[in-house]
């Protein structure tokens, strides 16, 4: 027994389709699929549009920067220049165009248990530091979902095979 939460993951503004959210709700209604909470319904964990949760994501990326778990890269002549000094980074985000990257400890391997594949291991030396905040100020899909899953108390996530490593 669980709850069906409808969350609108609209962080990719370049692919945003107007009224797609109402079409999703209409399709769910057509098939008599009733969500327990979401936009305009039992808003216990709202807002349910990720584009309306930017301050929450900002709080978390600032915490990551302060704890040296993430860093900014400032755009300069089309290149991303990393800034690892926390104080300078916090100043630059006020005035510069930037992205935030998660700092990966490339000396490690991560092991997880997947219900379908069993034990899976990832070698972090093969992974670049991923961008978690894009230059438009919006979080990436992965960063927003981890934060939202935590705050919405999501216990089970079902995604396609292509998302396993993320």
Regions found by a protein language model. Name each.
Residues 1-86, 136, 165-166:
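N-terminal Rossmann-like or analogous alpha/beta NTP/dinucleotide-binding catalytic cores
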Residues 18, 63-166:
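Active-site cores that bind ATP or allylic diphosphates and position pyrophosphate for catalysis
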């Amino acid at each position: 027994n669980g709850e069906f939460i409808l969350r609108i993951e609209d962080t990719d503004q370049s692919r945003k389709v107007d009224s797609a959210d109402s079409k999703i709700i209409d399709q769910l209604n057509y098939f008599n699929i009733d969500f327990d909470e979401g936009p305009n319904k039992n808003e216990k964990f709202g807002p349910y549009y990720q584009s309306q949760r930017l301050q929450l994501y900002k709080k978390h990326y600032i915490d990551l920067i302060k704890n040296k778990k993430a860093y900014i890269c400032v755009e300069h002549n089309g290149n991303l220049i990393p800034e690892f000094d926390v104080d300078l980074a916090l100043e630059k985000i006020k005035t510069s165009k930037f992205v935030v990257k998660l700092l990966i400890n490339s000396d490690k391997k991560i092991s997880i248990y997947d219900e379908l594949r069993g034990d899976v291991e990832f070698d972090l030396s093969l992974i670049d530091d991923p961008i978690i905040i894009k230059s438009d100020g919006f979080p990436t899909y992965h960063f927003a979902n981890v934060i939202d899953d935590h705050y919405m108390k999501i216990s089970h996530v079902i995604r396609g095979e292509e998302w396993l490593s993320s």
